[in-house]
């Protein structure tokens, strides 16, 4: 079975990897009979890869042990594998000696929230009414109009002010509007741009290195969310001395072979000002005594790795990254362009079907559409039952971007909010 009408050289190249995806030939019985499962929900999560699962089971499995010891063969093996995996991750994103790697949670959401706590931007909800921060020292965060909720709502719950950078007339990231906002808040002492590298709804990319350059010229910092694009693009934290990224976060579970991994955060250690780790516990202290005395480890990565680390998760992340590198980023992008062109050609001929941001075909392989007078969940169910296609409906955790794409004005938005609040979840 071919993905396009004619098998291309790239399709033939990727067959060697595709055949090892667990479930690639899976079938199930729907109301319409036996269907072959066709997975197209990669933007949400990747798929298990048999060689990685077998390597974890057969090569690492026999030596699984806690990493907090190096006096046994098992403890030493896991500790060495854990540290080697961390080095693989750092090298993949072109981190330098000043960058710190932290893994946490199950994806980008966990690490961006942890990072906000590390930066001292989160306070307990019951203490907010007692906290008054002068405007001059209140952080300002700039986000794009295309953010996933994780890189929007999490910032809204910090002590910072948050500004959405207006899109340009074509619905793209607008550097001119961004510069205006930076100038507007030039008096703020802590300026942050936290933007997605690519929309998880349309696959449209942002000029994040240019954003970083502008932030650095204005004494600010730039954080980039690679959750959507990470499995497919080069991640380069240090392309030059001006456009470097101060922090990145991504979700390895979206990689081929990545489900079951932790979120990844890499950031410049100069942003770390803390004496106390975010998660004090085992492995974070040099010593304690019965009288309340204690000293935390100086090394930031060790100090912020409290408790038994997710060593298998980190090892699996490194294996998924090595698989990405073996496939080749340019091969991945070239194949994505083939598929995007093919899907556009086929869907644009379907009556009453509208591709969102269809004027922008220069994108990663993320395509969202709606069908006139058809509820999205019914559409997803039909695709599943009739054709075996695995996808998802709804706003894809990007409700703000949905307003832009569907031209939802404030009055319509408020009406929808009222209906949803009253329990009419079909409108959601």
What is each PLM-predicted segment?
Residues 1-428:
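Pyridoxal 5′-phosphate
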């Amino acid at each position: 079975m071919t993905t396009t009408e004619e098998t291309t050289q790239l399709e033939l190249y990727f067959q060697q990897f595709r055949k090892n995806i667990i479930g690639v030939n899976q079938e199930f019985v729907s109301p319409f009979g036996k269907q072959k499962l066709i997975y197209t929900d990669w933007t949400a999560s990747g798929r298990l890869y048999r060689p990685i699962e077998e390597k974890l089971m057969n090569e690492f499995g026999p030596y699984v042990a806690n990493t907090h010891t190096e006096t046994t063969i098992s403890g030493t093996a896991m500790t060495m594998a854990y540290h080697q995996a961390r080095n693989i991750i750092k090298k993949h994103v072109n981190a330098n000696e000043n960058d710190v790697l932290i893994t946490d949670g199950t994806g980008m959401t966990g690490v961006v929230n942890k990072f906000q706590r590390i930066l001292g931007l989160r306070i307990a909800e019951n203490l907010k009414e007692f906290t008054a921060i002068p405007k001059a020292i209140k952080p300002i965060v700039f986000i794009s109009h295309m953010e996933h909720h994780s890189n929007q709502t999490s910032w809204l719950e910090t002590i910072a002010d948050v500004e959405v950078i207006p899109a340009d007339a074509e619905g793209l990231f607008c550097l001119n509007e961004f510069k205006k906002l930076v100038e507007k808040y030039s008096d703020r002492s802590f300026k942050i741009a936290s933007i997605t590298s690519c929309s998880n709804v349309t696959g449209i990319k942002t000029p994040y290195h240019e954003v970083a350059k502008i932030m650095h010229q204005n004494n600010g910092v730039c954080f980039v969310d690679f959750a959507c694009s990470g499995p497919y693009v080069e991640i380069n934290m240090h392309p030059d001395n001006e456009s470097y990224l101060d922090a990145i976060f991504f979700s390895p579970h979206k990689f081929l072979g990545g489900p079951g991994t932790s979120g990844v955060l890499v950031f410049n250690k100069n942003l770390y000002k803390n004496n106390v780790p975010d998660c004090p516990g085992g492995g974070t202290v040099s010593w304690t005594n019965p009288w309340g005395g204690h000293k935390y480890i100086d090394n930031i990565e060790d100090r912020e790795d409290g408790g038994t680390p997710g060593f298998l998760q980190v090892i699996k992340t490194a294996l998924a990254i090595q698989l990405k590198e073996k496939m080749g980023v340019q091969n991945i992008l070239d194949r994505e362009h083939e598929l995007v062109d093919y899907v556009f050609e086929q869907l644009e001929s379907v009556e009453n079907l509208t591709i969102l941001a269809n004027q922008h075909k220069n994108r990663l392989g993320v395509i969202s559409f709606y069908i006139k007078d058809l509820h999205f969940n019914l559409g997803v169910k039909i695709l599943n039952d009739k054709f075996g296609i695995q996808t998802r409906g709804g706003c894809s955790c990007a409700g703000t971007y949905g307003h832009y794409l569907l031209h939802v004005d404030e009055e319509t938005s408020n009406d929808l909010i009222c209906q949803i609040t009253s329990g009419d979840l079909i409108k959601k």
